[in-house]
Amino acid sequence: MEKRELVNIIDYTLLHPTANKADIESFLQEVVNYGFKTIFVQPYFVPFAVNWLADHDVNVGVPVGFSLGGATTHVKVEETKEAIRNGAKEIDMLVNLGALKSGDYQMVETDIAKVVEAANGLNTKVIIETALLNQEEKISVTECIIRAGADFVKTATGFNGGGATVEDVRLLNEIGKGKIQVKAAGGIKTYEDALAIIDAGATRIGSSGAIQIIRGETSTSSY
């Protein structure tokens, strides 16, 4: 895959907590200049991004339950509905890590299913923070995600330690057995990293350093 083709599978992201409106506007100009198909911004900036990109074929995505996943299901559902009203076209939700670590997989699955229902057919990806999980947890939560009807399992936010590895992407792809796609995010810093992750089975990549990757440079971003 050529570097420029990566714009079709990279979700270009600006979720830094100190990003302001001017930063978002510069980011959106880069999105248009490079031809990215999907982007992610914080919920506050979704209306601005949707309006700014009105004449361009770009999906604006939003994180839900970001970045720790501990919000109640009701809060995640309402966050999803508001984001959609504001024009969001993709949802990346964080799994309830506390419930997962407590072994309450029924709650984990219900939490995801309710957000999937609220998304009403839009692409829904579930972030599991692979660096914080053991292998049994990775398997169990991915099975929950499949049963809940989400479209993707996503490796990480990049904010909570660790990120995508070839081994984790390969494992999630094997667990998914074609029933769910894998989005890799966190720690993908070079074009070579991206190719290795794709070869392992990822069909989508999340990165705030996408332009550096496409240029053949090394991204300095952790997410």
Curated annotation (Swiss-Prot):
Pathway: Carbohydrate degradation; 2-deoxy-D-ribose 1-phosphate degradation; D-glyceraldehyde 3-phosphate and acetaldehyde from 2-deoxy-alpha-D-ribose 1-phosphate: step 2/2
Entry function: Catalyzes a reversible aldol reaction between acetaldehyde and D-glyceraldehyde 3-phosphate to generate 2-deoxy-D-ribose 5-phosphate.
Gene Ontology biological process terms, A to Z: 2-deoxyribose 1-phosphate catabolic process; carbohydrate catabolic process; deoxyribonucleotide catabolic process
Gene that this polypeptide is encoded by: deoC2
Natural source organism: Oceanobacillus iheyensis (strain DSM 14371 / CIP 107618 / JCM 11309 / KCTC 3954 / HTE831)
Endpoints of the signal sequence: none
Name of the molecule in the record: Deoxyribose-phosphate aldolase 2
Cellular compartments annotated: Cytoplasm
EC annotation from Swiss-Prot or TrEMBL: 4.1.2.4
Domain of life of the native organism: Bacteria
